[in-house]
Amino acid sequence: MAPSNLPPVFNATSQDIEMLLAAQCHLGSKNLQVHMEPYLWKTRPDGINVINIGKTWEKIVLAARIIAAIDNPADICVISARPYGQRAVLKFAAHTGAVAIAGRFTPGNFTNYITRSFKEPRLIIVTDPRTDSQAIKEASYVNIPVIALCDTDSPTEFVDVAIPTNNKGRHAIGLIWWMLAREVLRLRGTLANRETEWDVVVDLYFYRDPEAEENKEIEETKVPGAEEVGAAAIESGLVGDSWQAQATPGFSAGVAVPGTAVPGWEADVSTDWAASSAPAAETLADPAADPSVKW
C-alpha cells in the first residue's frame, strides 16, 4: 500500500505509515460510494472496507501543495461541524494562518454578503462532506475549490480533492489534519527540511471531551481524605453535629447538671442539727410591746 506516484522527496516514511495504521485511518465503513472505489484496497469478511493508505498519503501531499500555492493563508477556510474535528481545525488554523469555522456553519457565509460572517475564501477544507454539506453547496455556487476528508460512504459531489480516510474516528481525523499541517509547513519552508521533526505533537489535534477534562480537574483538586466516611471517621469522632465531643475517661468531672445546681448552695454548711436557723430579714412585731397594733 505504499505510495508510488510521488517524487522520492514526498515519499512517506515508515513512521508515517505506522501512525496512519495506528489511528485506524485505513478503516472505512461498510457502505461504498461508487466514486470512492478507486481508493479501496479490499473488503474484510465482516464487511468493513479497507482504504489504501498509499492513496491517502498521495492525496495528503496533493492537498498540501494546493494549500501552499495560495499566497495569503487567510484566504483558506477550514470547516468542521463534526465535534471530533473542531479542535483539529482550530489547531490547523493556528499553525498555518487559515480561518477556522468550528461548529455549525451559518448558511450564507459564502453567498450572502449582507451577513457579518460573510467570507470570500479561495479554498475550503472540510472534515466530512456529509456533515459539512451546506458549506460545500455554497462553495459550488461561487466556484470555490473544495478539499474534503472522505470516507468510503461519503458523497463526493462538488469535492475537488478527496482525501480517503476514516473521518469518523477522533484519532484518524486529528492525525490527518496534523499531517496536512506538517506538509504545508514543510512546503512553505517553515520546517527547514523533511528530516526536521515538527515539535508539535499529534495529541494536540485530538478531540478531548470537555466534561471528562472538567471531572479530571475536580479529582486532582480534591483534598486527600476529605471524602472519608464510615467506620474510620466515626472512630475518630469526626462524624456528627458540632456539639458532640469525643468521649474521654472522667468526662463527667466538673460538669454541672442543669436545673439542680444552685450557686453557693454548699456555703455555710452546719453540722449542728440543734442549732436554729437564722431569723428572716423581716420579723413580726410584738403586739404587747406596740399598743398601736390592733388584732
Swiss-Prot record:
UniProt-listed CDD domains: RPS2
InterPro entries: Ribosomal_uS2, Ribosomal_uS2_C, Ribosomal_uS2_CS, Ribosomal_uS2_euk, Ribosomal_uS2_euk/arc, Ribosomal_uS2_flav_dom_sf
Keyword Zinc: no
Location(s), subcellular: Cytoplasm
Subunit structure: Component of the small ribosomal subunit. Mature ribosomes consist of a small (40S) and a large (60S) subunit. The 40S subunit contains about 33 different proteins and 1 molecule of RNA (18S). The 60S subunit contains about 49 different proteins and 3 molecules of RNA (25S, 5.8S and 5S). Interacts with RPS21.
Record HAMAP family: Ribosomal_S2_euk (MF_03015)
Family recorded in the similarity comment: Belongs to the universal ribosomal protein uS2 family.
The protein's name in its UniProt record: Small ribosomal subunit protein uS2
Organism: Paracoccidioides brasiliensis (strain Pb18)
